[in-house]
UniProtKB/Swiss-Prot annotation:
Disruption phenotype: Grows slightly more slowly; 30% reduction in staphylolytic activity, increased production of lectin PA-IL, blue-green pigment pyocyanine and HCN. Increases levels of autoinducers 3-oxo-C12-HSL (3-oxo-N-(tetrahydro-2-oxo-3-furanyl)-dodecanamide) and C4-HSL (N-butanoylhomoserine lactone) in early log phase which becomes nearly wild-type (3-oxo-C12-HSL) or 2-fold greater (C4-HSL) by late log phase. Loss of swarming mobility and rhamnolipid production, loss of sRNA RsmZ expression, decreased lipase, increases synthesis of pyocyanine and HCN. Keywords: Activator, Cytoplasm, Repressor, RNA-binding, Translation regulation. The gene is csrA. InterPro entries: CsrA, CsrA_sf. It comes from Pseudomonas aeruginosa (strain ATCC 15692 / DSM 22644 / CIP 104116 / JCM 14847 / LMG 12228 / 1C / PRS 101 / PAO1). This is Translational regulator CsrA.
Amino acid sequence: MLILTRRVGETLMVGDDVTVTVLGVKGNQVRIGVNAPKEVAVHREEIYQRIQKEKDQEPNH
């Protein structure tokens, strides 16, 4: 795992098309903004896991 330190307002790049910007820090919460092409799915981990679980429960699997 790559670990980076960023301050509020600073951005990191993921590949050529995805940017992640630190928007704010309040206590133990960090607000981030993600800019990505429409074809790149961006989800919180718990939402992604729910989507995968629902896919696994479909009759075609």
